[in-house]
Regions:
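A short, Lys/Arg-rich alpha-helix, primarily the initiator
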Residues: 1-17
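Residues within the helices of the helix-turn-helix
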Residues: 9, 20, 49
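DNA-binding alpha-helical recognition surfaces that contact promoter or target DNA
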Residues: 10, 35, 64
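Polyanion-binding surface elements
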Residues: 11, 52-54
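Short alpha-helical DNA-recognition segment
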Residues: 16-35
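The DNA-recognition helices of helix-turn-helix-type DNA-binding domains
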Residues: 29, 40, 69-70
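Short, basic-rich loop-to-helix N-cap that marks the start of a DNA-contacting helix
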Residues: 40-52
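Short C-terminal boundary/hinge segments that cap the last helix of small helical domains
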Residues: 55-72
Length: 72
């Protein structure tokens, strides 16, 4: 998945999560989240769905952030 890291980090902050708290909320460790945000590993489909759920993303936000889709 081609994640828009900048937008994802923005949504994490907008929802008042620290990276550690967000990682725990989606069921991973902070180092694992860090690797995914750096592009060293990819989010699985299940992890991506959990991100959407925890951040309460709309379909458009999900597509833009987690799939790198430009809907404009």
């Amino acid at each position: 998945m081609r994640v828009n890291v900048k937008k994802l980090i923005g949504k994490i902050a907008e929802n008042d999560f620290t990276r550690k708290a967000f990682a725990e909320a989606i069921g991973m460790t902070e180092p694992t989240l860090r690797r995914k945000l750096r592009g060293e590993s990819e989010f699985t489909l299940g992890e991506s769905a959990k991100v959407r759920e925890v951040l309460n993303l709309t379909t458009a936000e999900y597509l833009e952030i987690m799939l790198g889709a430009n809907l404009n």
